[in-house]
Amino acid sequence: MKKIILTGGGSAGHVTPNLALIPKLKELGYEIQYIGTESGIEREIIENEKIKYHVISSGKLRRYFDIKNFTDPFKVIKGIFQAIFIMRKEKPNVVFSKGGFVSVPVVFAAYINGIPVIAHESDITPGLANRLSSPYCTKVCVTFPESVKSIKGDNAVLTGTPIRQELLDGSRIIGRRMCGFQNDKPVLLIIGGSLGSKFINNTVRNCLNELLKIYNIIHICGKGNLEEKLTERNGYVQFEYVSEEMPHIMNAADIVISRAGANVIFELLALKKPNLLIPLSRKSSRGDQILNAASFEKSGYSMVLKEEDMTPKLLLDKLKKLDMSKHTYINKMKASAVQDATNKIINLIEKYK
């Protein structure tokens, strides 16, 4: 039987594209296994899929000073040896890496064992993990045309980001019913990323009274960020994190406020959802979300609001403008040529079976 090992973790963005590939890989007869960390978000997500999960040690790749920067390299080295053992025991035909710090030991181990590695980079510029790993990859799938030049050599392949079929099959009716909405107001979905965004959460809650005059609101606010005093507010539903229900939640939305991680913005594109993107600022990130948002704004898929400019008043103004021009955005998204990433990646994997 053909065997593939998937890896990627640290945030949901390093896991969900793997989920999009799993049903097709199963159809093609692959035995699928996964390598991740013991406590990462990837573990619960993957184990819910009933896929064999291997735990390895991994350090975090930081761009700032931290005392752990001196100890984490030893965790990475330990992770490489653990991954080498897994590779030699399981003997996969190919490894697919979605990035994140856990992927680095896995890619190195596969390379040492002569196992082909296909990596995927969602953002315009590669993250630190993929920059370290890409020289050891057979091919690197990229999402944006601008990304091809960021990968050294000629092993970059433009595929786009795979979208889970169940996301496309979600039900607007079920999503609204899940949230208990009792009126026909349009639904505003707020996504702060899998780890949440206190900045977005606070700004939204500071203008909640005005927003609720216009919208029913679904607010995915991140773990530990629920506001207890708002749990009984009519028309306002909070979730720390959404997994299985996400297809219905996304399809229930009429307008979306979101961070600008590549996975979520391509999901919004696939679903043709008018959206206001609030990318992470350069103070909090390497600036990849700013580039992602700029690309989507240029293509006419998204309206953008800089985090440093964001106030309750400006947020309300932007949403009003977005609502007035939503059909223009929808038509632009309908004309997009970026699609079918799942099959493109699967076809690439099949070359190395």
UniProtKB/Swiss-Prot annotation:
- Domain of life of the source: Bacteria
Q: Which GO terms describe its biological process?
A: carbohydrate metabolic process; cell division; cell wall organization; lipid glycosylation; peptidoglycan biosynthetic process; regulation of cell shape
Catalytic activity of the protein = di-trans,octa-cis-undecaprenyl diphospho-N-acetyl-alpha-D-muramoyl-L-alanyl-D-glutamyl-meso-2,6-diaminopimeloyl-D-alanyl-D-alanine + UDP-N-acetyl-alpha-D-glucosamine = di-trans,octa-cis-undecaprenyl diphospho-[N-acetyl-alpha-D-glucosaminyl-(1->4)]-N-acetyl-alpha-D-muramoyl-L-alanyl-D-glutamyl-meso-2,6-diaminopimeloyl-D-alanyl-D-alanine + UDP + H(+)
Main site of residence?
membrane
Its Gene Ontology cellular component terms are: plasma membrane
Q: Which GO terms describe its molecular function?
A: UDP-N-acetyl-D-glucosamine:N-acetylmuramoyl-L-alanyl-D-glutamyl-meso-2,6-diaminopimelyl-D-alanyl-D-alanine-diphosphoundecaprenol 4-beta-N-acetylglucosaminlytransferase activity; undecaprenyldiphospho-muramoylpentapeptide beta-N-acetylglucosaminyltransferase activity
Where is this chain's protein located in or outside the cell?
Answer: Cell membrane
UniProt EC number? 2.4.1.227
Report membrane topology: Peripheral membrane protein
Q: In which pathway does it act?
A: Cell wall biogenesis; peptidoglycan biosynthesis
Q: Which Gene3D superfamilies match?
A: Glycogen Phosphorylase B
Q: Which key words are in the record?
A: Cell cycle, Cell division, Cell membrane, Cell shape, Cell wall biogenesis/degradation, Glycosyltransferase, Membrane, Peptidoglycan synthesis, Transferase
Q: What family classification does the UniProt entry report for this protein?
A: Belongs to the glycosyltransferase 28 family. MurG subfamily.
Cite the NCBIfam families for this sequence. Answer: murG (TIGR01133), PRK12446.1 (NF009102)
Q: Which HAMAP family match?
A: MurG (MF_00033)
Functionally, this protein is described as follows: Cell wall formation. Catalyzes the transfer of a GlcNAc subunit on undecaprenyl-pyrophosphoryl-MurNAc-pentapeptide (lipid intermediate I) to form undecaprenyl-pyrophosphoryl-MurNAc-(pentapeptide)GlcNAc (lipid intermediate II).
Official protein name in the record:
UDP-N-acetylglucosamine--N-acetylmuramyl-(pentapeptide) pyrophosphoryl-undecaprenol N-acetylglucosamine transferase
UniProt lists the gene as murG
